[in-house]
């Protein structure tokens, strides 16, 4: 017999989200004159705050252009189990970062094979990308 009263609900566990992105100070902003490292960092902080307010257990992990990116990603994935891994557009869409993107996909595949992958076009649509896979 349950000790819960009729109509009581059990909260679903929070979806754990790892948001991988290029460290803002490493982004090439030449194609984005209205953006800067400071503005991008603020957008990312705001996005993580909004994701947490929306009920996600979200963590942002910034990576470099390849020197330690795989190790940093592997360490983040070892720290806790993630349900969804979002790889940001800055890592995914810049042609010079293609091999880094491939490396990160493979690290996620190896270290978190059950995690769903999703992709955004900017920090502003990260929640929609996560919801597609959560």
Regions found by a protein language model. Name each.
Residues 29-43:
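Glycine- and acidic-residue-enriched helix-capping/strand-helix junction motifs
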Residues 71-107:
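Mid-chain, well-packed structural core segment of small domains
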Residues 59-68, 120-122:
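Short beta->alpha junction loops
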Residues 4-31:
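N-terminal, charge-rich interaction modules
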Residues 53-58:
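A generic structural motif
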Residues 43, 100-134:
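Ser/Thr/Gly-rich flexible loops in soluble cytosolic domains mediating phosphotransfer, phosphorylation
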Residues 2-11, 36-40, 132-134:
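Ser/Thr/Pro-rich, acidic low-complexity intrinsically disordered regulatory segments
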């Amino acid at each position: 017999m349950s000790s819960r009263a009729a109509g009581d609900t059990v909260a679903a566990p929070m979806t754990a989200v790892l948001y991988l992105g290029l460290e803002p100070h490493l982004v090439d902003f030449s194609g984005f004159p209205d953006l800067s490292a400071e503005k991008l960092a603020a957008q990312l902080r705001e996005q993580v705050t909004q994701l947490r307010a929306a009920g996600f257990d979200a963590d942002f992990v910034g990576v470099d252009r390849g020197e330690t990116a795989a190790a940093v990603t592997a360490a983040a994935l070892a720290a806790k189990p993630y349900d969804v891994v979002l790889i940001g557009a800055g890592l995914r869409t810049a042609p010079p970062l293609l091999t880094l993107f491939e490396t990160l996909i493979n690290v996620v595949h190896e270290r978190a094979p059950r995690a769903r992958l999703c992709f955004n076009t900017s920090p502003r649509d990260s929640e929609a990308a996560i919801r597609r896979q959560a």
